[in-house]
Amino acid sequence: MSRINKIMSGDKDITEDVLSVITITGITPDILDRFSSLLVMQIYTAFMSRTEDPFRICHEILCLEGKPLHGGSHTKPPKMFNRKPYLKGLWHKHYQGVGVPSMAQNLSNSLQKYGIPYLQEILEESERTGVTHYLTEEDAKKIAHQVVTEHYMRRSSDRKMTGHWIIYTTFEEKNYYLSLGKHTDDEAELRKMIEISCSYEFQFLSSILEKLPE
C-alpha cells in the first residue's frame, strides 16, 4: 500500500491513474513508498504533457535500487551536490530527457570529448601527401554517422550520458526520492520547493539539508 492515500482532481479521485503511471515502469510498492508526493505529481504531469518519459526516469531509480529491468544505467554515476549550499547533503542521478535539447547537449559533449577521427585522418593524410582532399557526399555521410550515431552510442556505453536530475537523499541505508530538476534550475528555488513539499513527509530531511545562513 502506497503512503500516498488519495489524489483528487476536483471531485474526481485520480489516485489510481497517477500511481499507475509510475508502477507500470516496474517501480514496486516498497520503492514507491519512498517517493515524495512532489515527485509523484512531477512524473505524472510530465507524462500527461508529454514533456518527459516516466520509463527513463524510473529506470534510473530502479538502477539506484539495484533492480534494473532492462540493463544498467547509461547516465553518469550518482553524485552529491557540493558546489552551492542550497542542496548540499542531497544527491542527484541523471536521467536522459526527451526531445532535441537533451540530445543536442549529449552530442555536443561527445563531440568535445571524442572529436571527429574520420575528418582528422583526412586532414593528416592531406598534410602528409600534400594533396588537397575535397570532401565528398560520402565523406559527409561518414562524418555525420560518426558524430551522431557512433559518438552517441559510445557515450551511452561509457555511462557518460547527461540529462536532467533525480534529486534524492539517503536515510538509514535507503534512498528517498524527492524531486526532479534541471541544470538550468535555480538551486535556491529547488531547495525551497523541496523543503516546503517534502519535509513534512520525510521529517529526517531537516537534519540532512545544510543549514543556510540567516
Across the structure, where does each feature detected by a protein language model lie?
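Hydrophobic/aromatic beta-strand elements that line small-molecule binding cavities or substrate pockets
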Residues: 166-167
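Basic, Lys/Arg-enriched alpha-helical interface segments
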Residues: 1-163, 175-176, 183-214
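Active-site beta-strand-loop-beta-strand hairpin of nuclease catalytic cores
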Residues: 170-178
